[in-house]
Amino acid sequence: LCVLCLLPQSPALPLPREAGGHSESQWKQAQEYLKRFYPSDAKSRDADSFGAQLKEMQKFFRLPVTGMLDSRVIVVMQQPRCGLPDTGEDLPSRNRPKWISKVVTYRIISYTRDLPRVTVDHLVAKALNMWSKEIPLSFRRVVLGIPDIVIGFARGAHGDFYPFDGPGGTLAHAYEPGPGLGGDAHFDEDERWADGRGLGINFLAVATHELGHSLGLRHSSDPDSVMYPTYGARDSENFKLSPGDIREIQELYGKRSKSRKK
């Protein structure tokens, strides 16, 4: 399992002249957040680049676009979220990565201690079914061999140059479709995972999001979308794709015929 995008190393940005009453730690957190989730050309990293990246983030999260660090921005930056960037090359659906085979295999290679294995198996299958019932694509679980999608839990550094950061922060990350590591999804075992009925991170919600990436979807700025990058508590019983999610996945794969919907 590896990260979808490896960001280039770069020197820290100089702090903007107007600190706005925010602490140095908040400014550093903002710099790291923007570098990770709104990456820009390493050659242009300066105070002006900070403002441009901040405006991009504010626009994505539908905040007032000021280019200034404020309390609303800080609140968003402190929310648990997916580890993938919110930006990327805007390609037409015909040129975006997707699975060609109509049957995609997956394998769960490691589990969390927070939930019974049978519960994890069930929730992964449920998350995949949410997507497959809308498109002409089926998923088959395998227990041996090399699957299309590898799913697992890990802590800290786990061999992909993209370490998890402990409780909170980034919850999971995944690959877009492709050979080798393409499609892989993994989850931070330092989180407290739940099935939606108790305290903790709703695994179904996060798995549905990450497996959306495994199918080729990007982050959405619609708060109702399962592809929204930050995590919010959701009811597992009523959890479902938004109309925008369905539209996006069908643009990639087409519609599943009504007779084949599960």
UniProtKB/Swiss-Prot annotation:
GO biological processes: collagen catabolic process; extracellular matrix organization; proteolysis
Keyword set includes Cytoplasm: no
Major place of residence: secreted
Cofactor detail note: Binds 2 calcium ions per subunit. Binds 2 Zn(2+) ions per subunit.
Any Pfam family matching the protein: Peptidase_M10
A GO term for molecular function: metalloendopeptidase activity
GO cellular component: extracellular matrix; extracellular space
Keywords: Calcium, Collagen degradation, Extracellular matrix, Hydrolase, Metal-binding, Metalloprotease, Protease, Secreted, Signal, Zinc, Zymogen
Keyword Magnesium: no
Signal peptide region: 1-12
Catalytic reaction list: Cleavage of 14-Ala-|-Leu-15 and 16-Tyr-|-Leu-17 in B chain of insulin. No action on collagen types I, II, IV, V. Cleaves gelatin chain alpha2(I) > alpha1(I)
Propeptide part(s) removed at maturation, as residue ranges: 13-89
Cofactor(s) of this protein: Ca(2+); Zn(2+)
Residues noted as binding Zn(2+) 2 in the record, renumbered to the chain: 82, 209, 213, 219
Coiled-coil stretches: none
Residues holding Zn(2+) 1: 158, 160, 173, 186
Positions of the catalytic residues: 210
Domain of life per record: Eukaryota
Residue interval(s) of motif Cysteine switch: 80-87
SUPFAM superfamilies: Metalloproteases ('zincins'), catalytic domain, PGBD-like
Function: Degrades casein, gelatins of types I, III, IV, and V, and fibronectin. Activates procollagenase.
Entry domain remark: The conserved cysteine present in the cysteine-switch motif binds the catalytic zinc ion, thus inhibiting the enzyme. The dissociation of the cysteine from the zinc ion upon the activation-peptide release activates the enzyme.
Family of this protein: Belongs to the peptidase M10A family.
Full protein name: Matrilysin
Species for this entry: Felis catus
Gene designation per UniProt: MMP7
